[in-house]
Amino acid sequence: MSNKLYQVLFVCTGNACRSPMAQGILEHLLPEDYRSKVKVTSAGTAAIENSPASSQAIAVAKEHGIDISKHRAQELSESLLRNSNIVFVMAKEHYQYIAQHYPQYRDNVFLLKSFDRKPNRRRHTDVPDPIGRPQGFYRRVFQELENEIRRILPRLLQLVDTNS
């Protein structure tokens, strides 16, 4: 039995909206007995180090009882990818960035909306970036993230169990 934490990484562009909300949602939804087994982090392909999450993302998360106010952005790095068991990206551009800059890790990288799903050419696979958009758009993105994380959670917990 391994004592190593199962590490989940969410990646977006600025690490200010989508990935911090996704991180907060997964941490919130993790069953109590998994919280000591799983470490959830987030990063951005073009993040400004130590920037807070956007005020709209913080407000929308708070509406759902999730506090991401202490979040500080970090740039995606080789060490973050190396230490992650699984990486969920918000859009194809993030997958392509990792495939180009860190090809050795691409087998652990998945589009959040495509993970554990049969391919469907009509399904939109990107989670839209809410930066600069109205609060209602942030709410829709939050709901989309929550729906996707609820959908993948059973499979993710299986992966954690397999790893321990």
Task: Explain the meaning of each model-derived region.
Residues P52-A59, V89-K92, L111:
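Short, charged low-complexity intrinsically disordered segments located at boundaries
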Residues S2-N83, P154-S164:
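Conserved active-site segments centered on acidic
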